[in-house]
């Protein structure tokens, strides 16, 4: 009986060691894959941000060149005056549209 108990003890211990190693390998592999995925996503995000910034810089350059060639440089006061005129036109058009809808209804 002593031999069977001792054999069961060593069998249980070996089972626990192998199971522990397998779990450790599984967790290590999972964390490794997670690290790879994280690195890939960070790189994709970095490339996306770089592309967005590049396009925005190109648009600013193109729009700036178009504005400068058509009208020349615009001061802040001129820009504000233009915005005020556009807002006034929009308000006037909204009022006319409202009157038109009221008369049609």
From Swiss-Prot:
One GO location term (cellular component): plasma membrane-derived thylakoid lumen
Give start-end of the signal peptide: none
Where does the record say this protein resides? Cellular thylakoid lumen
Keywords (alphabetical) are: Coiled coil, Thylakoid
Please state what the protein is called.
Thylakoid protein sll1769
User: What GO biological process terms does the UniProt entry carry, in alphabetical order?
Assistant: thylakoid membrane organization
Domain of life per record: Bacteria
- Organism this protein belongs to: Synechocystis sp. (strain ATCC 27184 / PCC 6803 / Kazusa)
Query: What PANTHER family does UniProt report for this protein, alphabetically?
Result: BNACNNG14650D PROTEIN (PTHR35745), OS04G0513000 PROTEIN (PTHR35745:SF1)
Q: Which cysteines are joined by disulfide bonds?
A: none
Keyword field contains Coiled coil: yes
Using the record for this protein, list the coiled-coil segments as residue ranges, or answer none: 76-105
Broad class of the protein's primary localization: other
């Amino acid at each position: 009986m002593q031999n069977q108990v001792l054999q069961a003890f060593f069998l249980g211990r070996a089972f626990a060691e192998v199971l522990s190693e397998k779990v450790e390998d599984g967790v290590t592999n999972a964390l490794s894959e997670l690290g790879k995925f994280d690195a890939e996503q960070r790189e994709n995000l970095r490339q996306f941000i770089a592309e967005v910034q590049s396009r925005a810089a190109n648009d600013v350059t193109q729009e700036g060149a178009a504005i400068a060639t058509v009208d020349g440089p615009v001061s802040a006061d001129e820009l504000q005056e233009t915005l005020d005129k556009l807002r006034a036109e929009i308000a006037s058009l909204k009022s006319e549209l409202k009157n038109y809808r009221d008369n049609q209804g």
